[in-house]
């Protein structure tokens, strides 16, 4: 289902965002780490947001490239892997396609991962 970025968020979408923001980062989870407290990253198609349902949980490192306090970006890359800010190609190579990330996010929200 496609939504414009200016479309109002429904109650169900707001609940999903709340679960994502309180949940685990999908990239950290793939590396066997748990990082709770995330941004809801909207997946894109052709440079445009697909819709509010097409969003995944990413920690501040994986979403915005913000390292943990006292840790340098190279140290973060070594331990946590690439950030989306390092470029989408390296991020997707490490963690999967948008479709794979969304599938994993849905499994995590259902408690299956």
Enumerate the language-model features and the residues they cover.
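Short Cys/His-rich "knuckle" micro-motifs
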Residues: 35-43, 67-72
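Short cysteine-rich loop/turn motifs with clustered Cys
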Residues: 10-39, 61
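Polybasic, low-complexity binding patches
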Residues: 47-56, 64-113
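Short helix/strand-bridging catalytic loops that position acidic/His residues to coordinate divalent metals
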Residues: 8, 42-48
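Charge-rich, low-complexity N-terminal segments
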Residues: 1-3, 7
């Amino acid at each position: 289902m496609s939504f414009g970025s200016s479309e109002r968020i429904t109650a169900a979408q707001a609940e999903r965002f709340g679960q994502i923001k309180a949940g685990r980062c999908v990239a950290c989870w793939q590396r066997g780490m748990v990082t709770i407290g995330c941004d809801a990253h909207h997946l894109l198609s052709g440079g445009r947001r697909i819709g509010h349902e097409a969003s995944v949980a990413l920690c501040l490192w994986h979403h915005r490239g913000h390292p943990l306090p006292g840790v340098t970006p190279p140290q973060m890359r070594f331990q946590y892997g690439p950030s989306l800010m390092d470029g989408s190609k390296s991020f997707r190579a490490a963690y999967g396609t948008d479709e794979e990330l969304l599938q994993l996010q849905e499994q995590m929200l259902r408690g299956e991962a």
